[in-house]
Amino acid sequence: MKIFSTKRNKIMVLVILLVIVFFFGLKSYFKTDEQNAEAVEQTNPLALNWLSYNEGLALAEKENKYVLIDFYTDWCGYCKKMDKETYSKDEVKKILNENFVVVKVNAESENKVIENGEEITERELARLYQVSGYPTTWFLESNHSRVAPLPGYVTTEQFIPVLNYIGEGWYKSITFKEYSEKI
């Protein structure tokens, strides 16, 4: 093996090998990013467009959809769990996108909103909705009239019937118990 006999030849071979490894490493890195982006688009085509309170109410009125308001706090573990385990499910997102405009309100925020022509904070808004625990989900009609609150963490299995009951307008004619027996 005369090719490796000099120190200069050994260094040259090593440099060539490193360049080849680096090139193929970069190529596979960028290919993986493209594949990951495509996989995310294919596996999760649904997304929830969370709006501010006033944007959500205006859009619901315009599109004649119900409003779902998620009252949360930054420190609330069950709020994060509901985001991760309930709102992230495709079936939940599908129902919400079809029938609701979704709104998030930080119940401890000093961000300003307009309620009944008056500027108040999101914290004050939570008090107006009598939110005392987190998360609390409120449902409104498109004209902003209140339908019902749903306090606490709710699993996907519990949430879907509630979304359908309200989103399909069943609450106007039968109780939730009657609806539950029907489905």
Question: Could you say what each language-model-derived stretch is?
Answer:
Residues 62-77, 102:
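Short active-site neighborhood of thiol/selenol oxidoreductases, capturing the structured segment around
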